[in-house]
Curated annotation (Swiss-Prot):
Protein name: Serine/threonine-protein phosphatase PP1
Keywords: Cell cycle, Cell division, Hydrolase, Manganese, Metal-binding, Mitosis, Protein phosphatase
Biological process per Gene Ontology, one example term: regulation of cell budding
Record-listed Mn(2+) 2 binding positions: D91, N123, H172, H247
Pfam families, sorted: Metallophos, STPPase_N
Catalytic machinery residues: H124 (proton donor)
Enzyme Commission number(s): 3.1.3.16
Co-factor(s): Mn(2+)
InterPro entries the record matches: Calcineurin-like_PHP_ApaH, Metallo-depent_PP-like, PP1_catalytic_subunit, Ser/Thr-sp_prot-phosphatase, STPPase_N
Cofactor annotation remark: Binds 2 manganese ions per subunit.
Chain residues that bind Mn(2+) 1: D63, H65, D91
Catalysed reactions listed for this entry: O-phospho-L-seryl-[protein] + H2O = L-seryl-[protein] + phosphate; O-phospho-L-threonyl-[protein] + H2O = L-threonyl-[protein] + phosphate
Length: 323
């Protein structure tokens, strides 16, 4: 389908039409429209840097994981684009029931507002992961496997990290023992898969751990964990104020670490119907003051109504509770 045959505004309108409907109502776009979203967004990702340099004011969101109606709630809170600038930190697909609507709306907004709307790559924007955790099955059930491969081509071109006003460093996972200079990120060529180890892997997979010093192995079996000393040294070396990342369920939707030098954001409330966590979005104003907007979890009793539909897939382990 040629670009001029695709009505982007109509795609966005249909994706937003289900606002106010019962959560779970699907939007079935044409396959040709989804292909357009993937190929056009991929062109834009490639034309922009792999390490984005962004300006405040901006709103930052963590994992969404196919919880489409919660994504719509985030926009209701923060303002639908272009009312506010947005940066999403990855993990749009898998685990939730509506990965397709979620990723399609995000790609549509990227195409419509390329300089105001930004999406980073999470560890689930990777074929070997989303083949297993739900996105492949959703594509196969609702469309076909070829379309899943088209998404893979798009995901392989997503940017990896962003710096806001030279002071806030953002990525999906965390720091890497291999990261000495920002130039190393800029040198990564796209399209690329996520390797099993090294800089790119760590930026999407690593986790902070308050109980360690330096670097340690990660319970996920991938990448590392890093202590507060690593965070402090990194910020001092690069003259930055804050690391903002996602990748872990946190009870309040956001959680500080290392004397407020790092914050974890998670934007999928009642994650998978199996947690009672809130979701959060971080607003960064022009003076780089950070505030949080919270999506409260549903009442506990609802959890058992909706949670009965568990997919049986293993869940991202929650952060260790404070002793």
């Amino acid at each position: 389908m040629a670009d001029q045959d695709v009505d982007l505004d109509s795609i966005i309108d249909r994706l937003l039409e289900v606002r106010g409907s019962r959560p779970g109502k699907q939007v079935q776009l044409l396959e040709s429209e989804i292909r357009y979203l993937c190929t056009k967004a991929r062109e834009i990702f490639i034309s922009q840097p792999i390490l984005l340099e962004l300006e405040a004011p901006i709103k930052i969101c963590g994992d969404i994981h196919g919880q489409y109606y919660d994504l719509l709630r985030l926009f209701e809170y923060g303002g639908f684009p272009p009312e506010a600038n947005y940066l999403f930190l990855g993990d749009y697909v898998d685990r939730g029931k509506q990965s397709l609507e979620t990723i399609c709306l995000l790609l549509a907004y990227k195409i419509k507002y390329p300089e105001n709307f930004f999406v980073l790559r999470g560890n689930h924007e990777c074929a070997s992961i989303n083949r297993i955790y739900g996105f492949y099955d959703e594509c196969k059930r609702r469309y076909n496997i070829k379309l899943w491969k088209t998404f893979t081509d798009c995901f392989n071109c997503l940017p990896i990290a962003a710096i806001i006003d030279e002071k806030i460093f953002t990525m999906h996972g965390g720091l890497s023992p291999d990261l000495n200079s920002m130039e190393q990120i800029r040198r990564v060529m796209r399209p690329t898969d996520i390797p099993d180890c090294g800089l790119l892997c760590d930026l999407l997979w690593s986790d902070p751990d308050k109980d360690i010093t330096g670097w340690s192995e990660n319970d996920r079996g991938v990448s590392f964990t890093f202590g507060p000393d690593v965070v402090s040294r990194f910020l001092q070396k690069h003259d930055m104020d804050l690391i903002c990342r996602a990748h872990q369920v946190v009870e309040d939707g956001y959680e500080f670490f290392s004397k407020r030098q790092l914050v974890t954001l998670f934007s999928a409330p009642n994650y998978c119907g199996e947690f009672d966590n809130a979701g959060a979005m971080m607003s960064v104003d022009e003076s780089l003051l950070c505030s949080f907007q919270i999506l409260k979890p549903a009442e506990k009793k609802q959890k058992y109504v909706y949670g009965a539909m568990s997919s049986g897939r293993p869940i991202t382990p929650p952060r260790k509770q404070k002793k």
